[in-house]
Amino acid sequence: MRAARARRLVSLVTSPARLAATLALAACAGASTSGRVGNAPVNVPRYGRLLAMADARRVDTALIHEILRAGSRPERAAAALAIGQVHGTSLAPTLRALLDDPDTAVASNAAYALGLLADTGGVAALAHALAAPPFVAHNAAWALGQVGEPARAALVTALAPTTAPHDSRVRSDLLLATFRLEPVPVEAVRPWLADSSALVRWSAAYAIARPYAAAGVRDLIPLATDTSGEVRAQVARAFSHRAAGDSLAALVRAPLTALARDPDPHVRINAIRSLATYGAPGKAAVVAATRDPDANVRIAAAEELGSVLDNTRAAWMSAWKADTGFMYRRSVLVSAMSQDVVLPAAEIDEPDSWAHQSDWRLRAAVADAGGAAPTILRLREISLPLARDPDPRVRSAAFAAMAPHADTAESHPWRREFMEYGLKDPDFFVRATAIGSLEGHAAADEVPLVLASYRLAEADTNSDARVAAVRFFVSAWKRDSVHFADSVVAALRALPVPHDMLARDAADSVSLFESWRRAPVPDPRPSAWYENIVRTRILPALGGTLPRAEIVTERGTITLELYAVDAPLTVDNFLTLAAKGYYDDVRFHRVVPDFVAQDGDRRGDGNGGPAYTIRDELNPRRYERGSMGMALSGPDTGGSQYFLMRAPYPHLDGRYTVFGRMIGGWSVLDALVQGDHIERIRGS
């Protein structure tokens, strides 16, 4: 398994950003905590001020220009990146000029920052930068994709076989940029499906498969037998009925069925998902996959059974018995419920039902299954009793299952009941879920109840319920402000300014919370803290010593290398939590076949965290197989949860902080299933 996985994309391709960093490290060899990197002295206090600026999301134009004019190479590169991180649109002209900077690290970060800004005024400059060294062209191509439609002509021109860059990595980035266009320029992508580079073929296939571009499906048929498993996986995805439609269904079904028997489990997973979109014609392959030797393939098949099986109970019982694993059976339970088949494990009145087991995960699974029920009546029958469960994680699952229906006309009779229990729950996330589910039809007469819930949430260590309540107030004000009682308006305006910026940001769009906007934003931390990050995290990494960490699981050990220059605050946060034992004796609470393995929640249901949030540190690292990212519930909501990529997913680039990569333990990553135990994480 390890040898086979070593041939995956992460090993076939060295990330241009990673290569750029490697060469930059070589050029800057000799760093020490004295603040000198090679012959270029790093001004530690000034670098610390830059970190503080980015952390506070403030644009300090004077500081940026000072660093760009007289700073060391690492400082200048970081300053260019920070402009994009703080959404410094006023400095877009500065970034465009930096595309010609003689330091390729600066120019490359400038290109990436223009992408974060989606700078339409920079299209010509970015297109010109495609002729720059690969380090720069790599991010210029990505940035053009972020700009989107205004960059279409530039992307199509750059992909013409007679003018395309020679570097296969830059070609790859150009192709990946096109999947963000609607429609995808298939004519420009098509020639690269036959390229000699597996990376280029994969990128071209991804550009068609990710957005389900129907115009390119026929062109992918020859690639169903490609030598690269990564390419075949994208072909399997593209053969979904969503892309192929009825007109090409007969043409792709045979190769798709063959891909469901592919030696690579990642390919089989995508093939099974696509076959399920055809309904009954895909039944045999999907059902057969429930007995696949790979656990993740079995789980993926179980998740799709609702698309291929009807409500014949015997077929569902057969599927249930195919595997005894928790995640497999949970998936069968949910799929069966979508066909209004209530398996014994979900029978609320049965004493042996999962709803009555001591393991909270089993009870939560029943609540989750209720959310898939085709009728409100069935949903209430299954999930509502579990909304009174003694465990907040089960109650949270129950309210989450009911949440999509709480704002509909059909659910109106029990909306008030939902508010009565959910808004008073002692658990912060139950309250957050309940409030969030009601936001769409927020009314003035409901604000007092939510205001009472907000006051309860002021004592929470987590901000979720406070933020949800503020969003409810804003929604109600926009929909129904004329019916707000004067006393309610006065009470809302008298609320203390929240300490957490997430709640303040949520209120930014209405005059009701004008005082919050005027309130000063304190520096997140003292300057000495940021300077210490520079000395202890950034300078050693610039000198070539990247921090490492090990995730010791029940299936083996995963070894990580952390990007302390690209995401210093995130890396420091992760290593600090690990040193405190925060990640000891927990489980992977979310594992999605062929996507991610996620951990970092001691609560265990995906809703927990360390009682604080950290800012995003978006950077040019890409989401390849083995990349490590910070999990979010929205911008700047990171904390302790992280995820490991089981396959490359470029659509995540620029949306979540990449702060590390795997350098060992590939077979462990492939074997993980949801619920697997983590003994400990330790950094070095």
Language model features with spans:
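Cyclophilin-like peptidyl-prolyl cis-trans isomerases
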Residues: 427-429, 445-684
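Sec-dependent N-terminal signal peptides
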Residues: 20-26
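Core helices of alpha-solenoid repeat scaffolds
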Residues: 60-61, 92, 123, 152, ...
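Bacterial N-terminal signal peptides that target proteins for export
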Residues: 2-20
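Structural detector for internal amphipathic alpha-helices that build alpha-solenoid repeat scaffolds
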Residues: 37-58, 74-88, 97, 105-119, ...
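Residue-level detector of alpha-helical secondary structure
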Residues: 63-66, 78, 82, 94-97, ...
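Alpha-solenoid HEAT/Armadillo-like helical repeat scaffolds in large eukaryotic proteins
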Residues: 63-71, 94-102, 125-133, 157-163, ...
